Every structure is written in structure tokens, then in C-alpha cells.
Curated annotation (Swiss-Prot):
InterPro entries: NA-bd_OB-fold (IPR012340), RNA-binding_domain_S1_IF1 (IPR006196), TIF_eIF-1A (IPR001253), TIF_eIF-1A_CS (IPR018104). CDD domains: S1_IF1A. Seems to be required for maximal rate of protein biosynthesis. Enhances ribosome dissociation into subunits and stabilizes the binding of the initiator Met-tRNA(I) to 40 S ribosomal subunits. GO terms for molecular function: RNA binding; translation initiation factor activity. The keyword Transcription does not apply. This is Translation initiation factor 1A 1. Belongs to the eIF-1A family. The lineage of its organism: Archaea, Methanobacteriati, Methanobacteriota, Stenosarchaea group, Methanomicrobia. It comes from the Archaea.
Length: 96
């Protein structure tokens, strides 16, 4: 029997929407987190109400964020990666 490969579909940040990868540094409460973004900026992230109950975020999680146009020090959390997706991102060189 040949070994089957598991296919992992991973959403990557979209450059046209100015999305970046980030790691959650700390939880601030009230749907807010501190993020260490891959572009070198520390941002205050906001979890939108539509994703609040669906997406449980903890320290150390890797997420996609969209920085605000008005204030670059703040961002909205768009997507949270699972552990197999984070491993795939590391293998492909998206995470440093």
C-alpha cells in the first residue's frame, strides 16, 4: 500500500489587502491582544465581534492581521492558524 499524503490548505496573507502574519504576545482583555508582526512592528490587535466566539486566541498563536489605514499601530485579527498550518508555514519559509 502506498502511503497517502495529507493535503493541508493554508490561507496566506494577501499583499493587496496589506495583510501580515503576527504572533500573539499577550492578551489584554476586552477582545484586544498585543501582536508582534512579521514586518517588525508591535501592534495592538482587535478581535472583531463576528469572530469573537468562533476564534479562541491564546498567547503564542499565529494569526493574520490587517493593519488599520488610519493608525498603523493597530490592526484587526482576520485569521487564526492551527498547529499543522503553522508547521506548513515554517517549512515553506513564511515564518522566521
Amino acid at each position: 500500500m502506498p502511503a497517502t499524503q495529507e493535503v493541508t490548505r493554508v490561507r496566506t496573507p494577501r499583499r493587496e489587502n496589506h495583510e501580515v502574519l503576527a504572533t500573539v504576545s499577550s492578551l489584554l482583555g476586552s477582545k484586544r491582544v498585543t501582536l508582534q508582526c512579521m514586518d517588525g512592528v508591535v501592534r495592538m490587535g482587535r478581535i472583531p465581534g463576528s469572530k469573537n466566539k468562533k476564534m479562541w486566541i491564546h498567547e503564542g498563536d499565529v494569526v493574520i492581521v490587517a493593519p488599520w489605514d488610519i493608525q498603523d499601530s493597530k490592526a484587526d485579527v482576520i485569521w487564526k492558524y492551527t498547529r499543522p498550518q503553522v508547521e506548513w508555514l515554517e517549512r515553506k519559509g513564511y515564518l522566521k
